[in-house]
């Protein structure tokens, strides 16, 4: 099953952007996932291709128009009525690895990228959108957040990352722990040495060290995640 992604944006030239590089770009070229970028502005009816207007009730900035966005969404739905609709929003559920994994089970998703002060709320009321946030901060638009979401999903598609163990060992993938420290050659650098256990060849001890490091780092930096981990085996 190919993972198909539709992106609704007023800046189609931003795509594929970073998604055309490295393993994500190679997967795109191989057809492991498809990208369909739709210019919202092309659905505006006036000669100026207006996509925004002043907010009712006053307030700063401009709001993206429901009629224009709605026409763009209808175009997507006419070709795939079962596409999963997603709106990148700081008010949404915070993205995590589990959400990304769930989204890869859909053959077609559509991501709406807002701009200005946001979109007319009636879009979210009329269509079955799922709002997703990539963090507690504000960006100028949804395009960068959209690329983050796409990359987190595409990496989980079978065949994209050649070493599946890399996926299993990454932060948040296994029991929501942060990843353990990594080292490579040389064994000594500027007075700093690789931990002896990693040079021992004893895989049982190495695995225990990795698990312990992962747990301790998670407990120190993201203590809210340790509630999902059985700490008795690490402490």
Curated annotation (Swiss-Prot):
InterPro entries: Alpha/beta_knot_MTases, tRNA_m1G_MeTrfase_C_sf, tRNA_m1G_MeTrfase_TrmD, tRNA_m1G_MTases_N, tRNA_MeTrfase_TRMD/TRM10
EC number: 2.1.1.228
Subcellular location: Cytoplasm
Reactions the enzyme catalyzes: guanosine(37) in tRNA + S-adenosyl-L-methionine = N(1)-methylguanosine(37) in tRNA + S-adenosyl-L-homocysteine + H(+)
The UniProt record lists the keyword tRNA processing: yes
CDD domains, A to Z: TrmD-like (cd18080)
Pfam families associated with the record: tRNA_m1G_MT
Main location: cytoplasm
GO terms classed as biological process: tRNA N1-guanine methylation
Any one Gene Ontology molecular-function term assigned to this protein's record: tRNA (guanine(37)-N1)-methyltransferase activity
UniProt keyword list: Cytoplasm, Methyltransferase, S-adenosyl-L-methionine, Transferase, tRNA processing
One GO cellular component, as annotated: cytosol
Residue sites binding S-adenosyl-L-methionine per the record: 114, 134-139
Gene3D superfamilies: 3.40.1280.10, tRNA(m1g37)methyltransferase, domain 2 (1.10.1270.20)
Purpose of the protein: Specifically methylates guanosine-37 in various tRNAs.
Family, per entry: Belongs to the RNA methyltransferase TrmD family.
Known partners and oligomeric status: Homodimer.
Protein name: tRNA (guanine-N(1)-)-methyltransferase
Organism: Ehrlichia chaffeensis (strain ATCC CRL-10679 / Arkansas)
Gene expressing this chain: trmD
């Amino acid at each position: 099953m190919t993972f198909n992604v539709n992106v609704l944006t007023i800046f189609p030239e931003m795509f594929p952007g970073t998604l055309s590089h490295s393993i994500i770009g190679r997967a795109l070229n191989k057809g492991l996932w498809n990208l369909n970028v739709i210019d919202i502005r092309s659905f505006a009816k006036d000669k100026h291709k207006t996509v925004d207007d002043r907010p009712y009730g006053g307030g700063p900035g401009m709001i993206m128009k429901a009629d224009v966005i709605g026409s763009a969404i209808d175009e997507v739905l006419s070709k795939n009525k079962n596409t999963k609709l997603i709106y990148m929003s700081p008010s949404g559920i915070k993205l995590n690895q589990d959400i990304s994994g769930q989204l890869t089970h859909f053959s077609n998703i559509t991501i709406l990228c807002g701009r200005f002060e946001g979109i007319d709320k009636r879009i979210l009321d009329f269509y079955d959108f799922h709002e997703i946030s990539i963090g507690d901060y504000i960006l100028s638009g949804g395009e960068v957040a959209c690329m983050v979401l796409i990359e987190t999903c595409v990496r989980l598609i079978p065949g994209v990352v050649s070493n599946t163990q890399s996926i299993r060992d990454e932060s948040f993938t296994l029991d929501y722990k942060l990843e353990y420290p990594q080292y490579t050659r040389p064994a000594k650098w500027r007075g700093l040495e690789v931990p002896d256990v990693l040079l021992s060849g004893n895989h049982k001890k190495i695995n225990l060290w990795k698990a312990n490091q992962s747990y301790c780092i998670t407990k120190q930096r993201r203590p809210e995640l340790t509630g999902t981990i059985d700490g008795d085996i690490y402490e």
